[in-house]
């Protein structure tokens, strides 16, 4: 029997396994549906280009047909290995905007506000450039670094942004977010530094930590609304793990799988569970609701030179040099995360904060990397940072081996399409600036014929895709309608918590890996210190005596 059963070894689960097993008197079990993270493509940064096609390492979900995207069903990759999506993502280290966490504080109290989050980000971080910065940490396990080998086109993009009257920002996680610049990444010595590498690998042999991979969780076991274990399937065999009398089940499967597992276990909207013949354990209607994600549209251009990372016979000599440089020195273009530079901008000057994010790629990227785009070109990803549209996760069936229903409901709020139109126009202005214009051969998409707002809207509806940041489906809050309380305990149940991106009340303005890791660190302290709702003050959140002194 275990004191803690953690379901999901992703960005959050690896942190929890590390922190909760630090007490040798506590037995911890970590269940992961995917395999161990031994595939070399995980650890070689440019391997990201091939991971979308890996069914072994990727859930490879498909959404429901999207009403406002021409009824298209969108591809939703999610990590399925130790490290979860931090093992297949673009490694971009972004915390979000301070105002994001002010909204979290309104929802869940002081323990989830910016002051607390900022201290935890610094505690977790081992930044290899900002060693004397007030905004970064150097003693944590999560390695954060500059890219080792920037493509010249990425530098040209930043210069062109400045020529287009966008200020340079040397640190998107510093004093302010707005501007163009180069992304820092979760890498160490030219290799991906996933949550598994940062928090799990060094403690994997702890005698009180059992890691069970290729274990597909099928149900949380309850006795009188108390979680007592988890059922899973491994190699076609049905298995169970149980908790001690005071033990806990912690769900860290992410914004898609966590609500699915809750519903399969009898926790969710009673009507939906009845529809699928699932016995009700607890009627919790908000499970799976409040789904938020960043929708993305691309500008793609052909280049007039061989400067980009190309797919062509002429690239073979450069590719071989890069391969040997990576093998022997951990340098060269294979250390690229592809999304090397970018920025945060406002769709209109009167806004008080950025609502658009750019990821610039010095290469072609087609269909999430699943299709090969031959030649030399470059791509700008443009996403709506603060979407107003809300969707849901539901069930397709009561079979735990079936994928859930994923309905992001993209562009259901008309404000979102207006933001994306502005993003296309700003992106084109950057590409028209001298430093990028000198590389330009032709615009591939949307294409030179797409100029009016109506034409841009039609293009967005026909091409927009996810940029992989789903959150919010087990919303945290002080209000009784929320799925989890500020201690991340599932409302109406005992001995079960949710700790992953699904608890976010609102989507952060940026990439979600770093905030998810921070959530897990905060949750671990809540659990270890036995903070409960009795520790809350109705007006200010957690009492100060429950905070670590160095985090005040």
UniProtKB/Swiss-Prot annotation:
Record field: catalytic activity: a primary alcohol + A = an aldehyde + AH2
InterPro entries per UniProt: FAD/NAD-bd_sf, GMC_OxRdtase, GMC_OxRdtase_N, GMC_OxRtase_C
Subcellular location as annotated: Cell inner membrane
Keywords: Cell inner membrane, Cell membrane, FAD, Flavoprotein, Membrane, Oxidoreductase
Record's GO cellular component terms: plasma membrane
Transmembrane segments: none
Recorded superkingdom: Bacteria
Main localization category: membrane
Cofactor: FAD
Gene Ontology MF term list: alkan-1-ol dehydrogenase (acceptor) activity; flavin adenine dinucleotide binding
EC numbers: 1.1.99.-
Binding-site positions, FAD: 3-32
Function: Converts aliphatic medium-chain-length alcohols into aldehydes. May be linked to the electron transfer chain.
Name this protein carries in UniProt: Alcohol dehydrogenase [acceptor]
Annotated source species: Pseudomonas putida
UniProt lineage: Bacteria, Pseudomonadati, Pseudomonadota, Gammaproteobacteria, Pseudomonadales
């Amino acid at each position: 029997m275990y004191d803690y059963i953690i379901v999901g070894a992703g960005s959050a689960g690896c942190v929890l396994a590390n922190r909760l097993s630090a007490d040798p008197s506590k037995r911890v079990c970590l269940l992961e549906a995917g395999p161990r993270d031994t595939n070399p493509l995980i650890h070689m940064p440019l391997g990201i280009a091939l991971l979308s096609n890996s069914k072994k390492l990727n859930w490879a979900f498909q959404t429901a047909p999207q009403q406002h995207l021409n009824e298209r069903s969108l591809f939703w990759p999610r990590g399925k290995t130790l490290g979860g999506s931090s093992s297949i993502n673009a490694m971009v280290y972004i915390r979000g905007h301070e105002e994001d966490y002010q909204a979290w504080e309104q929802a869940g109290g002081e323990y989830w506000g910016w002051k607390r989050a900022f201290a935890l980000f610094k505690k977790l971080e081992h930044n290899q450039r900002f060693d004397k910065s007030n905004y970064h940490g150097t003693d944590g396990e999560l390695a954060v670094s500059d890219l080792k080998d920037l493509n010249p086109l990425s530098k040209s993009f930043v210069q062109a942004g400045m020529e287009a009257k966008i200020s340079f920002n040397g640190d998107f996680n510093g004093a302010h977010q707005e501007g163009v610049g180069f992304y820092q990444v979760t890498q160490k010595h030219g290799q991906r530094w996933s949550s598994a590498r940062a928090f799990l690998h060094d403690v994997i042999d702890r005698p009180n930590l059992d890691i069970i991979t290729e274990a597909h969780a099928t149900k949380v076991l309850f006795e009188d609304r108390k979680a007592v274990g988890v059922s899973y399937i491994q190699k076609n065999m049905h298995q169970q793990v149980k908790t001690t009398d005071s033990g806990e089940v912690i769900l860290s499967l992410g914004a898609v799988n966590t609500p699915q597992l809750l519903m399969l276990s009898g926790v969710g909207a009673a009507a939906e569970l009845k529809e699928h013949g699932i016995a009700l354990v607890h009627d919790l209607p908000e499970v799976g609701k409040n789904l938020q994600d960043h929708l993305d549209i691309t500008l793609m251009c052909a280049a007039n030179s061989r400067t980009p990372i190309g797919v062509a016979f002429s690239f073979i000599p450069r590719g071989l040099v890069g391969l040997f440089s990576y093998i022997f020195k951990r340098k060269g273009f294979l250390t690229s995360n592809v999304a090397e530079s970018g920025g945060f901008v406002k769709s209109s000057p009167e806004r008080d904060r950025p609502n658009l994010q750019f990821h610039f790629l010095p290469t072609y990227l087609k269909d999430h990397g699943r299709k090969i785009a031959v030649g030399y070109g470059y791509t700008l990803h443009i996403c709506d940072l603060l979407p107003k549209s809300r969707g849901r996760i539901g069930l397709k069936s009561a079979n735990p081996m079936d994928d859930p229903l994923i309905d992001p409901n993209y562009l259901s709020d008309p404000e979102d399409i207006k933001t994306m139109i502005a993003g296309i126009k700003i992106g084109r202005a950057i590409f028209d600036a001298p430093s990028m214009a000198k590389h330009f051969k032709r615009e591939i998409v949307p294409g030179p014929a797409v100029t009016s707002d109506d034409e841009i809207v039609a293009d967005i509806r026909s091409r927009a895709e996810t940029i992989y940041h789903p959150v919010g489906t087990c919303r945290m809050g002080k209000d009784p309608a929320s799925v989890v309380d500020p201690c991340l305990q599932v409302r109406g149940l005992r001995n079960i918590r949710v700790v992953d991106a699904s608890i976010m009340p609102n989507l952060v303005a940026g990439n979600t890996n770093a905030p998810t890791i921070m959530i897990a660190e905060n949750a671990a302290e809540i659990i270890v210190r036995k903070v409960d709702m009795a520790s809350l003050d109705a007006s200010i959140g957690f009492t100060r005596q429950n905070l670590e002194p160095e985090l005040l």
